[in-house]
Structure formats: structure tokens, C-alpha cells
Curated annotation (Swiss-Prot):
Subunit organization: This enzyme is composed of six subunits; FmdA (65 kDa), FmdB (50 kDa), FmdC (34 kDa), FmdD (17 kDa), FmdE (23 kDa) and FmdF (37 kDa).
Organism expressing this protein natively: Methanosarcina barkeri (strain Fusaro / DSM 804)
Protein name: Molybdenum-containing formylmethanofuran dehydrogenase 1 subunit C
Gene Ontology biological process: methanogenesis, from carbon dioxide
Database matches in InterPro entries: Formylmethanofuran_DH_suC (IPR017550), Glu_synth_asu_C (IPR002489), Glu_synth_asu_C_sf (IPR036485)
Inhibition and activation profile: Inactivated by cyanide.
Chain spans, region 7 X 13 AA repeats of [GW]-X-X-[MQ]-X-X-G-X-[IL]-X-[IV]-X-G: 112-245
Highest classification ranks of the organism: Archaea, Methanobacteriati, Methanobacteriota, Stenosarchaea group, Methanomicrobia
CDD domains found in the cross-reference section: FwdC/FmdC
Keywords: Methanogenesis, Oxidoreductase, Repeat
Gene Ontology MF: a single term: formylmethanofuran dehydrogenase activity
Gene name of this polypeptide: fmdC
Chain positions of Sequence repeats: 112-124, 131-143, 150-162, 176-188, 195-207, 214-226, 233-245
Amino acid sequence: MTEGVLINENEVESKLEAVIKPGSFTGENAGEMAEVILIPKKAIDIKLEADVITPDSFAGKSAEEIGKLSVWQGPKTYPLSEFFEVTGNGGSSAAETLIRIKGDAMRIKRIGESMSAGKIEIEGSAGMHVGTGMKGGELVVYGDADSWAGMEMTGGLLHIKGNAGDHVGCAYRGKWHGMKGGRIVIEGSARHQLGGGMDGGEILVEGDVKSFCGIRQNGGLIFVKGSALRGVGAEMAGGTIVIGGKIERFSPGFEFVSMENSITSGEVELIGEFKKFTGDYAISKRAKGALYVVADTNPEL
């Protein structure tokens, strides 16, 4: 699912078209960017905590200074250069800094945490908490992303070209409010509790999701082009969920409202034949969540 294009599923049961506008999630374009390249030196056994890998941290620093930034491995800190060959200097600002990780980063956590501008490209998979707390900029993962991707992000674009784990765009453990802004695009599938506690922003999934997509959702849009297992919108109080495929087990707290032929939410416009439900009334009779399902793929609802 790419931005600014039309998705047409007329060759399958579900007839659904989606126009996704690029939006302004990444902030102003800084033009030509200074590029910092990180090349892994060795296989990583114990996972790294590398929240310093952001355009904000690299901006204004030379390659040597970037290499001296500290990362955690277990109870110890090491310089970034212990694990990466660093080439290139940061730009004069975060918006003018591009970080390119040339290799797999599945055992590196917290890449892009709280970044406000600029761009990160990971030429492989990414570890847990990638893009957590993003405020702006663009982060592209060319492989898969582990769990907690985009947790509590407020802005920016997180683009995962592979699959994603559990708790994408969700709230931190013990908190009730997850993602508040920005956009997450997943070209593959995602696992459990996508958008848990989501307050705003957009999550767009090309493939399928597992259980409890949109659990405790309060706002924002979740659009899943594929199917969902069960518990969609459980404890939902607000926001919008659209499922293009089949929901295997429908949540009992939702009531049918009407048939709709288009849905518009922010920069996303969906065209098709939808059944609209509201809920989750199993939790509160004042709930205002909207759940849309494509009629052709859910004839029994």
C-alpha cells in the first residue's frame, strides 16, 4: 500500500478502492540531506538499546563524534563504533540528516526513538520499539519490524515494507493512550493488538492482522486491507476501523447502523460497499467507535 495511489481489489471477493494521499506527516522537505552510513561490524548476540540512532542525535556531529555516542548492551554501555562502521557527517539540523543502516538491525532496539525530523532507512529488518515516540520525519524499514513499532508516536511516517510484530502504534505497558498522530504503513501483515489505545493518526496495513486490532481505541484510523482474526475494536470508545477482508470472530458489543459506499478520514478515502457498526457497547453505552467491514467478504454480519 503506497501513498498517493489507488488500491483496487476487483479480482478478489472484496471490491474496495482506497486513495491514500501523501499528507504532511514528515514535515518540511529539507532538500539535499547529509548522509550518515552505519555498517554492522559483527553479529550482535545480546540486543542493543540504540535510541541514539536518530537524525536529532547525529545532526551537527562528525562521523568520529557519532561513533562515540553510547549504546546499551545489557548492563554496560559501549560506543556506537563498537558495533558499526560509521561514515559521513550529520547535517546541520535533524531535517538535513539521513541515516542509512546497511544491514539487518533486528537485534537493535529503539532506532528512531523520539526523532523529530530527517530520515532513517534500514536496509533490513528492525528490532523492537523502532520509531517509538516519533514526532516527525520519515523512517523506512525495508524488512520486517519487531513488536512495539511506532509506540506512542505523535507525528512522522513509519513505513514498514515487510511484516510487523505485536502492539504496533500502541500504548506503553500500564498506560491507556497510544499513538496520537502520524502515519504507520505496513506493506505486509501485523500480529496482535495493532493500535492498542490509539488516540489519533493513521495505521494502514496491506495484509492481515491477528487478534484485538484496535483494542481500547479512542481516535484515529486503522485500515486493514486484509482479514482479521477476532476481537476487532474490543473496548473501543472512538475512532475508526475499516477491515477489507473477513473478520473470523466478530465482537459482540457492536451494533449495525447502516450501509455506506464511501469513508473519508483525514488523508484517506475508501470507496466500496461497507457495513457500518458502532460500539463497543459491551463496555459503555456512550461508546462512539465506528467499525466498517466490506459487505462482500462478511455476508453473515
